[in-house]
C-alpha cells in the first residue's frame, strides 16, 4: 500500500469554460497517509475547489487526481473514492437529515444496507469518537453549532473513511465550538490514523497541522511545516492572511530589539 493517499498532478479547473480564469491552475500536491494538512488562502484562492476534487465532487478540466491510486475521472471508482474520502462542510445543517442524532449518524449506513448489528456498533463507536454519545437521543436542532458539526463528523466517520476533508468546517462556529470540533479531529487523526485535510481561515488551527499549504489565485504558493511557513510572516501577510499570535508576538519582540529564535 502506497504512503500517498491523495495526489493532484498539474490539476486545472474552471467553473466557466468560456472564461480565461482558472480556479485551479496547474496544482500539484500529495498528501501522505495519516498526515494532517491545513490549506490556507484568501477567499477565491481555490482551496475549496481543490477539496472538492479530492472527493470527486468536481473533476479536472485537465491533469489528474488520484485517491489511493484511483483516478477520480473513472466513474467505476466513484463509489470506492467516496468511501475512502469523507467530507464535512461549513454548515452542519446541510449535512444533517434525521430528527434524532443516532438516526442521522446511521443514515448513510442504512442506505448501504449495512447489517443491523454492525451498524449499531459503528454508530455507537463513531458517536463516542466524536464526543456526542450522550446526545444520541437528542434532536439535532436543539444542539449547539459545535455539537451539530460533531454529529456531521460522526456520520462521516461511521462510513470508515481513510481520509477526512474539512471544507471550512469550523467557519460558522464560536470559539468553544471550534475547539470542540478540532479536539475531535485531532483525536481521529492521532488515535485512529485518519488522514485529515483541513481547509481553514484560522491560523491557530493551521499551526497545529503537520504541514501547511498556502494557495493564491489557483496556485500553491507556499508549502512546509507550520514553523517553516509562519516564520515568513511578511510573505504570509502579503497573501492577505494573518499569522498565528505566537509568530506575531515574535515579530514584535524582534522589532523591539529582543533576540528570539525562529517561530
Where are these regions (language model features)?
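Helix-to-loop junction immediately C-terminal to a conserved catalytic motif
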Residues: 55
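The feature captures the beta-strand-to-loop junction immediately N-terminal to the Walker
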Residues: 40-42
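Conserved ABC transporter NBD signature motif
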Residues: 63-73, 81
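Conserved ABC ATPase "signature" region
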Residues: 117-135
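Conserved ABC ATPase signature
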Residues: 139-143, 147
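Catalytic Walker B motif of ABC-type/P-loop ATPase nucleotide-binding domains
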Residues: 164-167
